Amino acid sequence: MASVQEALAQLLTVDGAMCAALVDSTSGMLLGSAGSGLDLELAAAGNTEVVRAKLKTMKSLGLNDSIDDILITLGTQYHIIRPMAQKEGLFLYLVLDKARSNLA
């Protein structure tokens, strides 16, 4: 089984990848990171709030489902949040340079 750092390094091989992180969504704590371009500790805490807000909204709507991923499109970047199905409470966070990546 690959280590956290090896897995994050593998994510950075995606075209346009700038940085990646593994985040504990119960605490907002950064468990591992790779790459550069953002303050990943700050991003981990902020994106934990995004995940929590979506889960709360889903519960309020009575949606008995799970989040596959959350895509946030900025002017120059894509931010992808992907909860880990096999490890509840953790999510992967990947930042892509929009000009150098392709979501297809």
Show where each model-derived region lies.
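Non-catalytic interaction/Regulatory regions outside core domains
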Residues: 1-104
